[in-house]
Each structure stands twice: as structure tokens, then as C-alpha cells.
């Protein structure tokens, strides 16, 4: 697609204005067998290299470390643009800052900061709620959100808080992954993580009828906790980060329905004993399933916490110290899943599809 269309100055929106004609030409290029896809043998967490051959010439572009970090552009081996390639395993300054925080500090910030400083988070609700609306009719992706809502209408699923969270979050992900021409407010660089950190909290806020300030603070807490929980993970790995975003959602839901730090702490601790460890097998329509499972887990963790209960620290990845549990999850995603990622790639490549 990038060889035929796109705006190189638009960052992650590089393909936002691609025409259907260009998309059809790209599909024809793939169908013709002109595109070869291989797995790069590199140590980088995120790496992509494209080489284009045409009329006896070739051009090369390489990305590493971040989705928009083009560190090398060349034509016929003549370097046109270059900058230092990020070292494998490099921890960006923002991630290092987040790793130095604690759940208690984040809670204190979200609940005491001047509300004007965090009003911007309402944009997350506006953008991601538009994705919910777009995905509710089932016209995008696998239509999971619409399927759940239809099950409610037919009496096959209950119309309760957790089911609504699950359905609406799935609908937004359906739209996001199914190509709806709408932006998402991201979290940790991911639209789906932004959806998980936003939609369950807004559903809870609508259910509880809380005032604007409580709503804003809950969204801010959710997104901040999601960033904190994700900070120990590589920029890309076999670890599905919808689960860390859901830790933020669980915190935000508790702030809506209870407000106390103890409730938030119990919910986040319980999340480390639930869906954490779910694998990422690449971006696709099935992300809606993982996203909705994570949202549902967040809702259940919040309800468990409101009953004064949590998963005890003697269980597996859970820890009595919630910050230690979060650090452990970062270690799991960084060290524990090193071999998982290449195995997933191998299974995908074995299908011989582009």
C-alpha cells in the first residue's frame, strides 16, 4: 500500500486518505505474487524493513523502536536519510518515568489534581464513543459487539453492567479493526488499549449517574494506570496489552462506583490473576474478542473489589504488593515471552499468506 499511496508526513495516519482505487491496486499487487514477506532476524522488539524493486533500481526504508521511527532511507545503496538506530531493549524516558511511579501516587494525582488539567481526557470519551456507535450494528470486523447486544435483545444474555461494558468495548474494537474511518484515542500507542481504558469506565459512569468531575477523574485514573501497567512491557511482544489497559479500566470503574483507594488496589491486584498472559497474535478482527474479554475481566474485578474481596497474594502472579505484581507482569512480557513471539510468527508464516 505504501508503494502506491499514503502521506509520509501524517505519522500513524499515513494511510488515512487512501482511495479505494489505490487499495484495489495494492490488492492486485499482492495477488500477482510481487510481494514477498519474511521474518527479520533481528533483536529489536519492533522492526520493519521494506525494499522496493522497480526498473533496475531499489529503495529501502527501515523502522525500529517505534512505529513511526524511520531510521534509514536509501536508494540504490545511497543513504538519503539516516539517524541512530535505537538499541534493542532500550527503555524510552517516558517508560522509565512511569516505572518509577506507584499505584498510590497515580490515584492521588487523579483524585486531587486540578480538574482543568485533566479535562482533555474527555476527548478520549468522545472519540472512542464514536467507535462504539459505529460498531454497534455489526458492519465492521466480526461484529462481536452487535452479537452480544443482539443476544441481550433475544434474552440470551443479561442486560447488566458487565455485559454492557463487554458489548460496547467489543463494538468499538470491531469498528477500529474493521476499518471504520474514525480516529481512536490511544493508550501506550494502541487504539485498542485506549478503547479498553475508556469505554468500560464511561459505561460505569453512565450506569452510576456520577457527576462530570467524578467521570473525568475516573477516566484519568484509568488511562494513567493503564500507562503504568504497560510501562514495563516492550513496545511489541507476544503479550496482549489489552489486559494491562484493563487494569486501568478496573481502577477507573472502582473510582466511579466506590471512590476509595483500597477498592482500586483490590481490583488491580485481582486483574493480575485473571486474563494477564493472553497472547497477541497480531492486529486483526479477533482483537475484539481479546479486548472484550479484558473489559469483562475489569468489570468483574471491580465488582469483586466492591464486595471487599480480591485474589490473595499467594496465588501465582498476584502479589500482596500491587506494584510488585505489576512489575512482575512487565517481566513476564519482556523475559517470559521471548520465545513465544517467534513461535507465533512461525505459525502465522506457515499459512503462507501476506
Swiss-Prot record:
Top-level lineage group: Bacteria
Any single biological process term in GO: L-cysteine catabolic process to pyruvate
GO molecular function: L-cysteine desulfhydrase activity
InterPro entries to which the protein is assigned, alphabetical: Ser_deHydtase-like_asu, UPF0597
Family the UniProt entry places it in: Belongs to the UPF0597 family.
Name of the protein in question: UPF0597 protein PPA0217
Lineage: Bacteria, Bacillati, Actinomycetota, Actinomycetes, Propionibacteriales
Amino acid at each position: 500500500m505504501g508503494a502506491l499511496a499514503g502521506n509520509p508526513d501524517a505519522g500513524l495516519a499515513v494511510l488515512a486518505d487512501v482511495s479505494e482505487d489505490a487499495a484495489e491496486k495494492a490488492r492486485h499487487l499482492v495477488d500477482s505474487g510481487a510481494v514477498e514477506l519474511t521474518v527479520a532476524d533481528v533483536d529489536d522488539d519492533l522492526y520493519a524493513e521494506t525494499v522496493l524493486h522497480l526498473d533496475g533500481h531499489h529503495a529501502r526504508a527501515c523502522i525500529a523502536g517505534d512505529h513511526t521511527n524511520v531510521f534509514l532511507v536509501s536508494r540504490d545503496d545511497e543513504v538519503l536519510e539516516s539517524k541512530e538506530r535505537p538499541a534493542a531493549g532500550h527503555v524510552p524516558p517516558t517508560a522509565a518515568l512511569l516505572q518509577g511511579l506507584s499505584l498510590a501516587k497515580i490515584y492521588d494525582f487523579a483524585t486531587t489534581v486540578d480538574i482543568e488539567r485533566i479535562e482533555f481526557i474527555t476527548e478520549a470519551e468522545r472519540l472512542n464513543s464514536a467507535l462504539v456507535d459505529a460498531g454497534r450494528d455489526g458492519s465492521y470486523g466480526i461484529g462481536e459487539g452487535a452479537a452480544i447486544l443482539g443476544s441481550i435483545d433475544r434474552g440470551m444474555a443479561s442486560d447488566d453492567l458487565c455485559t454492557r461494558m463487554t458489548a460496547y468495548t467489543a463494538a468499538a474494537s470491531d469498528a477500529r479493526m474493521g476499518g471504520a474511518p474514525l480516529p481512536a484515542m490511544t493508550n501506550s500507542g494502541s487504539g485498542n488499549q485506549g478503547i479498553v481504558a475508556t469505554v468500560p469506565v464511561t459505561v460505569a459512569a453512565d450506569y452510576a449517574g456520577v457527576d462530570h468531575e467524578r467521570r473525568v477523574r475516573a477516566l484519568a485514573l484509568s488511562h494513567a494506570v493503564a500507562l503504568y501497567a504497560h510501562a514495563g512491557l516492550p513496545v511489541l511482544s507476544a503479550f496482549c496489552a489489552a489486559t494491562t489497559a484493563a487494569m486501568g479500566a478496573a481502577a477507573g470503574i472502582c473510582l466511579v462506583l466506590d471512590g476509595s483507594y483500597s477498592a482500586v488496589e483490590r481490583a488491580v491486584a485481582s486483574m493480575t490473576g485473571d486474563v494477564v498472559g493472553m497472547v497477541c497474535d497480531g492486529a486483526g478482527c479477533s482483537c475484539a474478542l481479546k479486548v472484550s474479554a479484558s473489559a469483562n475481566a475489569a468489570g468483574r474485578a471491580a465488582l469483586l473489589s466492591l464486595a471487599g474481596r480480591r485474589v490473595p497474594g499467594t496465588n501465582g502472579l498476584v502479589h500482596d504488593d500491587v506494584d510488585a505484581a505489576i512489575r512482575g507482569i512487565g517481566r513476564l512480557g519482556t523475559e517470559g515471552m521471548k520465545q513465544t513471539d517467534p513461535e507465533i510468527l512461525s505459525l502465522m508464516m506457515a499459512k503462507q499468506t501476506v
